[in-house]
Amino acid sequence: MMGKLRAALDARDAIGPDFVVMYRTDAIHVTGFDDALHRAKSAVEVGVDMVFVEALETREQMKRALEEIRAPLMLNLIEGGKTPLVPVQEAEAMGFKFIVPALSALFAAARGMYDVMTKIRKEGVSDGYLDKLFTFGEFAEVVRLEEIQAMEERYIPKKILEEKYHGKKHIVGH
């Protein structure tokens, strides 16, 4: 393991200071928390920039990891995962430097897609669900469609844009 880390660190040093090497250990699940700490501390000794101890199971483990690992720590928060769902502000106050609600948006999007498609399958229409949906204008604003289309006009040849939009103006504002 240390040889691979040294190779990653050499690559980081060759690339420049904006490249971060994060060490991840999943050892808790296999060999336990103490071994995960040992592995993380060994990686820090070699020179990694950040550590991610996957699946911390209690706030006590979180605190202990923060106390014993002398590097910035990442915490991922996954609904239904092993790590307690602590508010981001609490995780920051504890000392975590990189906090990732890794699947929250994906889980919410999947639930929303499932619910609306189930409604359409059962009733044939999304009516009655519209208050949970973006309007096209809201969607265009959130995904910054006007900016995307401005970049298209700047970087894509006019002929290709005409083919893409069948000679019509973009569809912003629908």
Task: Please report, for each region that a protein language model flagged, where it lies by residue.
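Alpha/beta enzyme core
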Residues: 1-101, 107, 114, 118, ...
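Active-site pocket-lining/capping segments in soluble small-molecule metabolic enzymes
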Residues: 101-152
